[in-house]
Amino acid sequence: MKEPTTEIEIETSAVATILPPPLPPTASPHQALVERLKDYGQEDVFSLWDELSPEERDLLLRDIENLDLPRIDRIIRCSLHSQGLPVAAIEPVPENCVSTVEERTKEDREKWWKMGLKAIYEGKLGVVLLSGGQGTRLGSSDPKGCYNIGLPSGKSLFQIQAERILCVQRLASQAMSEASPTRPVTIQWYIMTSPFTHEPTQKFFKSHKYFGLEPDQVTFFQQGTLPCISKDGKFIMETPFSLSKAPDGNGGVYTALKSSRLLEDMASRGIKYVDCYGVDNVLVRVADPTFLGYFIDKSAASAAKVVRKAYPQEKVGVFVRRGKGGPLTVVEYTELDQSMASATNQQTGRLQYCWSNVCLHMFTLDFLNQVANGLEKDSVYHLAEKKIPSINGDIVGLKLEQFIFDCFPYAPSTALFEVLREEEFAPVKNANGSNYDTPESARLLVLRLHTRWVIAAGGFLTHSVPLYATGVEVSPLCSYAGENLEAICRGRTFHAPCEISL
């Protein structure tokens, strides 16, 4: 007998009622960033989002995601707010803070030279080169250090500076050979580039085999960039999918050294002192033993070489004391009215505000660590009004910058060391044909100085053009500051222009 069967009907509507409800749509990365940017009043960067291709949208998202928005917002707000605020009055630098050329004795110079060479021999000096700029004003898109100013040797600024390091290393090794076994001396060279100069600078050094230096004694690191802003603090868009950015000034070196962990690298190598300078001075005495010895002797936290202003209205920044008994710092020439710029010291006859900043500095490593931490917390940047590339063409906007001299207010002690302009300061900033700081003016300063060295060493010159327009070039591999030239020059005649080399 057939068993009865039971059919069970399942209503589909009943099944549907037990399914979980659909999830709400997830916010797109674009929408999430818009909400974040609203917190900082910068959501306009997405105003052209609907017109962008998928690839362009990805580029814009990456550009924004790479920003430290809280930090940048703090910098913008604090920097804009600081405009127009009263600042402490300035005073002239006290006389006892400056070692002048005329008061320096031969014994002082010899003592400091030996002290500096000893510290270099012991590996206590590192050198930082500020080399983020391009040679745009010189008519070149290459890093400025690649520039050849037209010396007889045809050497670039980078090569001249590298060879000065080689010379100092040799001098330190020779000076200490009597007291210690002769051994190679190595000065670590840290070169700060920018996003525009980093790769070409590295390629230039590699193609020239590091100019005789060991590759592992040269370290390249990049300074940071910050968005360019309008006068009301809004980001400027260079294209519909990218922000307009600019390097954060040569004072960005402090943050860059910290973020690259190079301050730790220096400490691990036993470096105690750091020489810091700009690339565009062809007469710079890199790793100057005398300056280093003076710095050590004074037990200062920071020091700077200074030159006297050529005339009261010269457009240079000068060292001052900020506030009654306050720290030494640098002010731009625009902060000095005509009466202050022309005021003289009744005792010395010098201008009261005469000590020009020429970006030749020395720091202890301990102080650099303090500065890197201090400037990271100090969100007030200099606002430089510039033409900024934008989607509407070049517009007037603001670049956010720190300057190398922003460190000095943090220093418990700063010592100033006067040098002669004609011996140590030949800037290369403007194209030939300009009124000052050209490759031609720098070339002549080098030739004239080196000609004096050769004549002092017993050499003679012949020349087909007036001597004021020519001269000789002494290779840094022969002499650092005019020393040890007698064996090469005495009784010999050189036809200018030429290079004297080993």
From Swiss-Prot:
Disulfide bonds: none annotated. Its cofactor is Mg(2+); Mn(2+). Pathway: Nucleotide-sugar biosynthesis; UDP-N-acetyl-alpha-D-glucosamine biosynthesis; UDP-N-acetyl-alpha-D-glucosamine from N-acetyl-alpha-D-glucosamine 1-phosphate: step 1/1. GO terms for molecular function: UDP-N-acetylgalactosamine diphosphorylase activity; UDP-N-acetylglucosamine diphosphorylase activity; UTP:glucose-1-phosphate uridylyltransferase activity. This is UDP-N-acetylglucosamine diphosphorylase 2. PANTHER family: LD24639P (PTHR11952:SF2), UDP- GLUCOSE PYROPHOSPHORYLASE (PTHR11952). InterPro entries: Nucleotide-diphossugar_trans, UDP-sugar_pyrophosphorylase, UDPGP_fam. It catalyses: N-acetyl-alpha-D-glucosamine 1-phosphate + UTP + H(+) = UDP-N-acetyl-alpha-D-glucosamine + diphosphate; N-acetyl-alpha-D-galactosamine 1-phosphate + UTP + H(+) = UDP-N-acetyl-alpha-D-galactosamine + diphosphate; alpha-D-glucose 1-phosphate + UTP + H(+) = UDP-alpha-D-glucose + diphosphate. The lineage of its organism: Eukaryota, Viridiplantae, Streptophyta, Embryophyta, Tracheophyta. Disruption phenotype: No visible phenotype under normal growth conditions, but the double mutants glcnac1put1 and glcnac1put2 are lethal. Its main location: cytoplasm. One of its GO terms (biological process) is UDP-alpha-D-glucose metabolic process. It is an enzyme of class 2 (transferase). Its EC number is 2.7.7.23, 2.7.7.83, 2.7.7.9. Expressed in root tips, stipules, lateral root primordia, immature anthers and at the branching points of the flowering shoots. Substrate binds at N250, K429. Uridylyltransferase involved in the biosynthesis of UDP-glucosamine, an essential precursor for glycoprotein and glycolipid synthesis. Can use UDP-glucosamine, the 4-epimer UDP-galactosamine and UDP-glucose as substrates. Acts redundantly with GLCNAC1PUT1. Required for gametogenesis and embryo development.
